[in-house]
Every structure is written in structure tokens, then in C-alpha cells.
């Protein structure tokens, strides 16, 4: 009884796109840094820890802020870390001090929808629910919530809308 012939070496896999794999590996190896101050000061020749140390940032927060209180050493024993790139810290602080954008907005379609409903019906939500523009068949309560959302985000526009309706 003979042996089964042994398969030797690796065979080429035709189902894998090598070009795509190489591109993905390159992206993973050198990720895009979204923060502009850090990206401008980044040195590809240095490691992550050294780059961050030059900027005055901590690569490992557990080492920079230990959980257990360690014994207090003399100030002479602890060498002061020199920050080689202080402009990075200043840039990050400037970015952090900027006001954040509102994440929840109202789409232009919803603004148009609410304006149409308020112009035609005022505060009559039951009539709004029967309107032909109510494509999604919102209930009166759902329409009221949308109108209230519009009131919160655009109070001046809503007041002008109601005032123009009263004038008619």
C-alpha cells in the first residue's frame, strides 16, 4: 500500500486581489492622523512613543498618571521632561477651546415640510395629518414634535412664519 503524495509548497490563490491587499496593508501601517497639529509635527522616522514625548503628550496614560500613589521622590531625582515641540500642545489647546458644532440639525426637506404645514394649517395638527404632503403618514403627535423641533432650532424663522400667517 503506497503513501498519498505529499503536497509541497504554497500554491497561488487566484481569489485574492494582491493589489488591494498591499494597499490595505500600507493604509494600516501608516494611518492618517486627523489632528492637524499632530500630523504636521509627526516624524515618520521615530516611534509613536518618541513622537508623542517630543510633543509633550503621553503614549501610555497608565505610566504618566499611575493609579496607585507612588512614593514621592525628590524633585532633584525626577528629571524634567523637555518638550521639544510645544507648538503642538498650543495647537491642541486652541482646538479644544473652540466651541463644538451642534450634532443634531434639521434637514432642508424637513424644514420645507414644517414650513408648508404651518403656513397652511397654523397649529391644527389633525388637519396637517390629513394633508396630501404628509407622505410618511405622520400622526398629529409626530407632526407636533417636528414643529417643536423646528421651533427650537429656528425660533426667529418660526416667529416670522406665524406672524406672516396672522397677517393673511
UniProtKB/Swiss-Prot annotation:
<dbReference type="GO" id="GO:0005730">
    <property type="term" value="C:nucleolus"/>
</dbReference>
<feature type="region of interest" description="Disordered">
    <location>
        <begin position="59"/>
        <end position="79"/>
    </location>
</feature>
<protein>
    <recommendedName>
        <fullName>Nucleolar protein 16</fullName>
    </recommendedName>
</protein>
<feature type="compositionally biased region" description="Basic residues">
    <location>
        <begin position="20"/>
        <end position="31"/>
    </location>
</feature>
<comment type="similarity">
    <text>Belongs to the NOP16 family.</text>
</comment>
<feature type="region of interest" description="Disordered">
    <location>
        <begin position="20"/>
        <end position="40"/>
    </location>
</feature>
<dbReference type="InterPro" id="IPR019002">
    <property type="entry name" value="Ribosome_biogenesis_Nop16"/>
</dbReference>
<keyword id="KW-0539">Nucleus</keyword>
<dbReference type="Pfam" id="PF09420">
    <property type="entry name" value="Nop16"/>
</dbReference>
Amino acid at each position: 500500500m503506497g503513501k498519498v503524495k505529499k503536497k509541497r509548497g504554497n500554491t497561488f490563490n487566484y481569489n485574492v486581489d494582491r493589489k488591494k491587499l498591499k494597499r490595505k496593508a500600507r493604509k494600516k501601517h501608516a494611518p492618517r492622523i486627523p489632528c492637524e497639529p499632530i500630523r504636521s509635527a509627526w516624524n515618520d522616522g521615530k516611534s509613536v512613543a518618541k513622537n508623542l514625548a517630543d510633543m509633550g503628550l503621553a503614549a501610555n496614560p497608565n505610566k504618566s498618571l499611575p493609579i496607585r500613589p507612588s512614593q514621592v521622590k525628590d524633585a532633584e531625582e525626577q528629571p524634567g521632561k523637555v518638550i521639544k515641540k510645544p507648538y503642538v500642545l498650543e495647537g491642541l489647546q486652541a482646538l479644544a477651546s473652540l466651541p463644538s458644532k451642534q450634532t443634531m440639525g434639521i434637514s432642508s426637506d424637513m424644514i420645507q415640510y414644517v414650513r408648508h404645514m404651518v403656513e397652511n394649517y397654523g397649529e391644527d395638527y389633525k388637519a396637517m395629518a390629513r394633508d396630501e404632503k404628509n407622505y410618511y403618514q405622520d400622526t398629529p403627535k409626530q407632526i407636533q414634535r417636528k414643529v417643536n423641533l423646528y421651533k427650537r432650532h429656528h425660533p426667529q424663522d418660526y416667529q416670522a412664519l406665524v406672524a406672516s400667517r396672522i397677517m393673511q
